[in-house]
């Protein structure tokens, strides 16, 4: 539930189903604007927070709804190459990418801070030129203090998911912040059992025992050949692979669930 007397206000871009929002609300923040174009994600977001996000953030009519005076901009934007990238790459060189829209909103609204997330491959994308351009825009064109980005794994902070992401934070020059240390791992060990739905799960989320055995056999054959195979079969005392959108095999986490049969997996995850 939103905080009545918030410590700060933030906006949530590329919101997905609301991971950023949940985290910032838990430390006293109030979300004053949300954007997410995917219709299915919008439905889940509404179920989680009671409101539907605005749509495509590249549209000027969407940007017009962003209020003034918020403190923090959050954005988990996708990794895209720039036509001109590297040390000389500037604000206009990023036009046509979703990072340009993020940077444009920062430039217009001048938030006290921003909190950006991307896949860890951003560090090496286009031989490092993409990240170099992003940092050049944030530091030199927009004037924010931006410490070197850091790759953080969610499993080191009490989340039962092996999810490595790169984080970029920045602070408005008026704050006179010159140093920033990323948090150190909390060593809070969490497993899937800590987040699994407590209520009975609908049978449509389950696979048949026969199909599961087929996957297990297929996975074993691939492993014997030295190949990886996307499906991971997880028990209550384990952690999941990174949970991402998409339908490819490497993105599936099958969880053994003993509530219906002794050997039946489910992909039902709290908040999904």
What is the predicted function of each stretch?
Residues 62-70, 80-252, 256-267:
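Class I S-adenosyl-L-methionine
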Residues 34-35:
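The conserved SAM/SAH-binding core of class I Rossmann-like methyltransferase domains
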Residues 23-30:
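A short, Lys/Arg-enriched amphipathic alpha-helix followed by its capping loop at the start of a domain
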Residues 43-65:
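S-adenosyl-L-methionine
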Residues 38:
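Conserved SAM/SAH-binding beta-strand->alpha-helix loop
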Residues 14-17:
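Class I SAM-dependent methyltransferase "Motif I" SAM/SAH-binding loop
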Residues 9-11:
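Conserved beta-strand elements of the Class I
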């Amino acid at each position: 539930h939103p905080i009545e007397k918030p410590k700060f206000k933030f906006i949530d871009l590329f919101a997905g189903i609301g991971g950023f929002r949940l985290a910032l609300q838990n430390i006293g923040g109030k979300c004053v604007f949300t954007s997410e174009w995917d219709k299915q994600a919008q439905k889940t977001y509404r179920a989680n927070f009671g409101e539907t996000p605005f749509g495509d953030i590249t549209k000027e009519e969407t940007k017009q709804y962003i209020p003034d005076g918020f403190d923090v901009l959050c954005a988990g934007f996708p990794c895209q190459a720039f036509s001109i990238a590297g040390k000389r790459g500037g604000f206009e060189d990023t036009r046509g990418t979703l990072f340009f829209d993020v940077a444009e909103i920062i430039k217009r609204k001048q938030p006290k801070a921003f909190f950006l997330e991307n896949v860890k491959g951003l560090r090496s994308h286009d031989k490092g030129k993409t990240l170099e351009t992003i940092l050049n825009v944030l530091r030199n064109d927009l004037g924010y203090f931006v410490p070197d980005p850091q790759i953080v794994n969610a499993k080191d902070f009490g989340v039962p998911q092996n999810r490595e992401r790169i984080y970029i934070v920045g602070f408005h020059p008026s704050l006179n912040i010159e140093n920033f240390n990323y948090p150190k791992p909390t060593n809070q060990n969490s497993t899937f059992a800590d987040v699994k739905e407590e209520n009975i799960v609908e049978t449509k989320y389950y696979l048949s025992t026969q199909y599961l055995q087929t996957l297990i056999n297929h996975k074993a054959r691939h492993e014997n050949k030295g190949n990886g195979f996307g499906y991971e079969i997880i028990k209550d005392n384990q952690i999941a692979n990174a949970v991402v959108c998409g339908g490819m095999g490497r993105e599936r986490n099958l969880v053994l669930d003993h509530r219906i049969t002794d050997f039946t997996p489910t992909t039902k995850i709290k908040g999904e």
